[in-house]
Amino acid sequence: MTAKFDVDYVLANITEDDKIALLSGSDFWHTHAIPKFNVPPIRTTDGPNGIRGTKFFAGVPAACLPCGTALGATWDRDLLHQAGVLLGKECLAKGAHCWLGPTINMQRSPLGGRGFESFAEDPHLSGIMAKSIILGCESTGVISTVKHYVGNDQEHERRAVDVLVTPRALREIYLRPFQIVARDAHPGALMTSYNKINGKHVVENPAMLDIVRKDWNWDPLIMSDWLGTYTTIDSMNAGLDLEMPGPTRYRGKYIESAMQARLIKQSTINKRARKVLEFVQRASRAPVSADETGRDFPEDRALNRTLCANSIVLLKNDGNLLPIPKTVKKIALIGSHVKTPAISGGGSASLEPYYAVSLYDAVVEALPDAKILYEAGAYAHKMLPVIDRMLSNAVIHFYNEPPEKERTLLATEPVVNTAFQLMDYNAPGLNRGLFWATLIGEFTPDVSGLWDFGLTVFGTATLFVDDEMVIDNTTRQTRGTAFFGKGTVQEVGQKQLTAGQTYKIRIEFGSANTSPMKAIGVVHFGGGAAHLGACLHMDPEQMVANAVKVAAEADYTIVCTGLNRDWESEGFDRPDMDLPPGIDALISSVLDLAADRTVIVNQSGTPVTLPWADRARGVVQAWYGGNETGHGIADVLFGDVNPCGKLPLSWPVDVKHNPAYLNNMSVGGRMLYGEDVYMGYRFYEKVGREVLFPFGHGLSYTTFSVSPEATVSPSVFSSDSPPTARVLVKNTGPVAGAQILQLYIAAPNSATPRPVKELHGFTKVFLQPGEERTVAIHIDKYATSFWDEIEDMWKSEEGVYQVLIGTSSQEIVSRGEFRVEQTRYWRGV
């Protein structure tokens, strides 16, 4: 229900304390309410690929959409708009007025921990995808919060690192997606990044925030990332409206003190409070549910399945190995991801899904008459798999005292698995700063043998099985990457177990502040977390041998493996581009035997090294596909969906080939963006370095022809009448399909060093066999402009510009040109 209040009246009549209270959150997810003036609290919620609601722990299940790079791989404005609508509806069901997304940072390195959250390495593609999903979300009444402005392109020391970037690269690459969003979508909120830009944290950097409000004439609510406010005076004066989360750390009484010292003006407080009230007024129009609920509807499942299938990129299909005929009699499914799909990355993307379809179940459904052989082949987990389906009667008890003391039970919560994240958990009487918990449950293994147990913790924890201590993770802790970079490495123990016998599992847990570990540059959300995993101990060589055996028996083999949220997550970056240990050996062994009938399906949010790619006939990139991961992959493998995804980022042969390789972590608190504007394909093309798969690459089960000459009209660029490129495209193959045509602009005669070409438009066209259509791609002023650092303005340089239309950045199929007759400078959007 819309809150009925007049902003001017409220601002003129509320107390100074109320004004100041508005400028920070009331708790982890809400803004402050002023009931006397009918100003309600506004609920915000993560995350980039689904709506978690207000609880990391014991939350309401949610729809899980494919990850950001998967959505970027669709190159589909309409699908992204539909995805935004679904996210908006999920927000409404969770009682949330404001979605904390989308993420539009740049994948300058394949190692970035949150690379999977963003859409693309190209700023134009990223901005257009963001615009589409924002407009979809905000059509439901929910406000979108585009993030993280700007330069949070890696996780290493993200709160402390000073990103050193030239003004030109900042404008042309890293700010451009936000600029497109400001021009085309103007969402209601913007979230600042944790890091510094050129010496000053963005959250308190007036030059950076003035770009948004003054240069782009866009006036969103500007909020901090969670615990990403570092000062009172500087952040207020720079333009930060809302410190999140609450309770405040840098506002409240500190603003009062700064006012008394005349370090913050009354007009500044009024301006920030007005912006929060305007945000509340707009957000409160969203018809949110009074309670957090689910909405797992058939039409949402169908959309999620379409999103997943359309995101899948067919990287190789030598000899038309795919699609696999549904008449196949015997098929081998190999890989850790076959029965345990990777549906999302970690961190803010984590949520409790309504369901997750595995590839195994999807293949069983698609091939009811086939014999299906399965072997894991090699484990791909970094942390042992959480105990869930073999767990029963599990609860967690909360106390303010450790287990060795007499203590009072404060709360009991049921749990469905042995992982918990308590950053936002609270209970009456619980001391959030220091508390203890005991998880107890019954574990019934399905296989006899020696079992491995692994315990990772942010805090301290000890594992007991039938009251025998199996793991002590309390005293000799080593920092790892889990839980936003605050957790320990996994401590491992073993125990001999019998199938069908029930064992008592007990975890004695101490909250975050019981841990002696300290770290710089990572976010301390508090509360604490733990992950207990378990699996049967297996000999790696025997696992590979078992996999090779079933591959030898099968007519076709599908190997599905890759990364998961253990490897790609907020809070840390990957150390290398490699697949998990043992995976390459598994794939190579299967290819040695059956390369002519084996398809490799990789799940990751960003590129991984594929040393066996030249020997594989069929390679599919399936990303993190959300709830419908298994269905989406199976739909493509068996030809129910003709693959149409295109890579939204370049796929290097080796991590050392990446332009950010020498500058991908904080060194002494600084990180130099030394590649300047030559990021991604711009770098590979400029230096002539080969990649494994180029930006924009993706194959189809059909073929297309495109007219070699693009008609560009008008031939002279005018800001009043910018040109449009038109080409004729025809489906020359046997099945219906979609082609994504990518428009690149080259300025070969420019006096200023520029990339060989840059993406400035694209279109996706669906055609039946034999159908042809003329498609148009519009060209805007960004296509001819670069940032002139001397004039501190955009410069559209006179000269002839080449129009290059391709099916990837390397496959140019049509050409045209236009000219700019007079150099001009401009600012704004």
From Swiss-Prot:
Protein role: Beta-glucosidases are one of a number of cellulolytic enzymes involved in the degradation of cellulosic biomass. Catalyzes the last step releasing glucose from the inhibitory cellobiose.
Domain of life: Eukaryota
Every PA14 domain range: 389-548
Keyword Glycoprotein found: yes
Keywords: Carbohydrate metabolism, Cellulose degradation, Glycoprotein, Glycosidase, Hydrolase, Polysaccharide degradation, Secreted
Top class in the EC scheme: hydrolase
Catalytic residues, chain numbering: D225
Record family assignment: Belongs to the glycosyl hydrolase 3 family.
One term of GO molecular function: beta-glucosidase activity
Enzyme Commission number, as recorded: 3.2.1.21
Protein's UniProt name: Probable beta-glucosidase H
Disulfide bonds, paired cysteine numbers: none
Chief subcellular location: secreted
GO-annotated cellular components: extracellular region
Name of the gene this protein is made from: bglH
SMART domains: Fn3_like (SM01217), PA14 (SM00758)
InterPro entries referenced in this protein's UniProt entry, alphabetically: Cellulose_deg_GH3 (IPR050288), Fn3-like (IPR026891), Glyco_hydro_3_C (IPR002772), Glyco_hydro_3_C_sf (IPR036881), Glyco_hydro_3_N (IPR001764), Glyco_hydro_3_N_sf (IPR036962), Glycoside_hydrolase_SF (IPR017853), Ig-like_fold (IPR013783)
Reaction catalysis annotation: Hydrolysis of terminal, non-reducing beta-D-glucosyl residues with release of beta-D-glucose
GO biological process: cellulose catabolic process
Pathway: Glycan metabolism; cellulose degradation
Glycan-modified residues: N13, N304, N473, N602, N627, N664
